[in-house]
From Swiss-Prot:
InterPro entries: APLF_PBZ, HPF1. This is Histone PARylation factor 1-like. Belongs to the HPF1 family. Residues 28-41, 54-69 have a biased composition (Basic and acidic residues). One of its GO terms (biological process) is DNA damage response. It comes from Drosophila melanogaster (Fruit fly). Cofactor for serine ADP-ribosylation that confers serine specificity on Parp. Switches the amino acid specificity of Parp from aspartate or glutamate to serine residues. Acts by completing the active site of Parp: forms a composite active site composed of residues from HPF1/CG1218 and Parp. Residues 18-93 are annotated as: Disordered. One of its GO terms (cellular component) is site of DNA damage. Its main location: nucleus.
Length: 449
């Protein structure tokens, strides 16, 4: 009986007699046969006609050339990238070394702070190029009559050497009248000036009793007499009343004009003491005002009309007598309620702080204890949408002039102005109470020397 072929062929590892007697272990011939068959299949392709072969050769050569071209371009690109990368790395390394050499031996934070200052200075310089400076630094915008009055001042005195501030110097020299605040910006005094903190600009020419609603524009040199625009809402920039105060005499304000021109004439009539030498210039200046208004056909808002309209909206006079204006619903009586005590009772409480026979600490404690229920009632009023009550008491605390009450005043003014959507007044009030001064010279330029 013939033996079967082992499935492992000559690769079988079994050597036992039983397996060898049963199976043959020949070499695997099929592999060679398959190889031969494959060789026969390939051979006809290699023996094709010469024309076909040349065509195929051309077809095969073209992709090869393209591949070579692509390979060459790719290689060039890689070389360029490597070169650029090397150049970039070298440049980066060079810059790094330069930066490290500059920083070496120096305080890194000082360098960083210097860069920040340069950035802030650049922003400030850009801001000085437009009237946006006024809104940004003083948090308010000026009415049209303000800019018209500035043009008039420029016509009073023309000096090519000082085109912007010749008029200001003329009014100061002849009438002892300083045009300050936003007028100084128009005169170019803030350009190139030393930078201050935000609060410094809000305190610029802000006298001791000036509430946030008031902004100084005129000052009688060397005195506490000053005039300014009154805004019940920070965004107000049309038909603003102008008020007057003498900080040496107290906190009361008086509305004197409905525009800057009339305020100037009021000053010339009431706060300027003319001499025989200045009478001629006084008369000439008054005529110049009338001529300018006539030539430019300016119709300016008048005091009587503006004050009459405002009085309808005043809910409480307060200590400064100018009154406060808040939204008030006549039907529901929501928006304001009277304080828990009258003005006279409130003044009696505060009078204890002025007594010299009572220890200041004890007086302060006693006054605060009496004021606390009044303040609590005002805060409850705020919770019930009567925001005017907290505003009234806060203004009264501020106008009392006692710095011991600043914290109480702030605790009333902040929520009141916040609920009335007057955040600019919060910033102004806080900045003022931080450094409140009885000085007459309150210019930022002297503060930053």
């Amino acid at each position: 009986m013939p033996k079967e072929d082992c499935k492992y062929w000559d690769k079988c590892y079994q050597q036992n007699p039983a397996h060898l007697s049963k199976y043959n272990h020949p070499k695997k011939q099929q592999e060679h046969e398959v190889d031969g068959a494959e060789g026969k299949k390939v051979a006809p392709k290699r023996s094709a006609s010469s024309q076909s072969g040349e065509q195929k050769k051309e077809e095969q050569t073209e992709p090869v050339n393209k591949d070579k071209s692509n390979t060459s371009a790719s290689s060039t690109e890689m070389v360029n990238k490597d070169t650029a990368k090397g150049s970039y790395e070298a440049e980066t390394e060079e810059l790094h070394k330069e930066a490290m050499s500059n920083i070496s031996g120096k305080n890194y934070m000082e360098i960083l702070e210097k860069r920040i200052r340069l950035s802030v200075q650049k922003e400030y310089d850009n801001l000085c190029e437009s009237n946006e400076f006024i809104r940004h630094k003083f948090l308010v915008e000026m009415p049209p009559d303000f800019y018209e009055f500035w043009k008039f001042v420029g016509s009073l005195k023309i000096d090519p050497a000082k085109p912007k501030d010749a008029g200001l110097e003329h009014l100061d020299k002849v009438f002892q009248l300083q045009l300050v605040g936003p007028f100084e910006f128009l005169a170019g005094k803030f350009h190139g000036a030393k930078l201050g903190e935000p609060g410094d600009y809000l305190r610029h020419w802000r006298f001791y009793y000036d509430p946030p609603e008031f902004q100084t524009i005129f000052v009688r040199r060397g005195t506490g007499i000053h005039y300014g625009y009154w805004r019940d809402v920070p965004q107000d920039k049309e038909n603003l009343l102008i008020a007057r105060n003498d900080s040496a005499k107290g906190c009361q304000f008086q509305f004197v004009a409905g525009n800057a021109f009339d305020a100037f004439l009021y000053y010339l009539e009431h706060d300027f003491a003319a001499t025989p030498f200045s009478c001629g210039q006084l008369a000439g200046t008054k005529k110049a005002v009338a001529k300018y208004l006539s030539d430019n056909s300016l119709e300016l808002a008048q005091l009587d009309r503006l004050q009459r309209e405002r009085n309808k909206r005043v809910v409480a006079k307060t200590f400064h007598r100018a009154g406060i204006v808040v939204p008030f619903d006549q039907k529901t009586e929501v928006g304001y309620r009277p304080l828990a005590v009258s003005d006279s009772e409130l003044k009696k409480m505060l009078a204890m702080l002025e007594r010299k026979d009572v220890d200041n600490g004890a007086a302060k404690q006693a006054v605060l204890e009496k004021l606390q229920p009044v303040a609590n009632a005002a805060n409850i009023a705020v919770d019930e949408s009567d925001f005017g009550s907290a505003l009234e008491l806060g203004i009264d605390m501020f106008c009392s002039g006692h710095k011991e009450l600043h914290m109480l005043a702030s605790s009333l003014l902040v929520p009141a102005y916040s609920m009335l959507s007057r955040p600019q007044f919060i910033a102004i009030a806080k900045a003022h109470m931080e450094q409140r001064s009885r000085e007459d010279n309150l210019s930022i330029f002297d503060v930053l020397k």
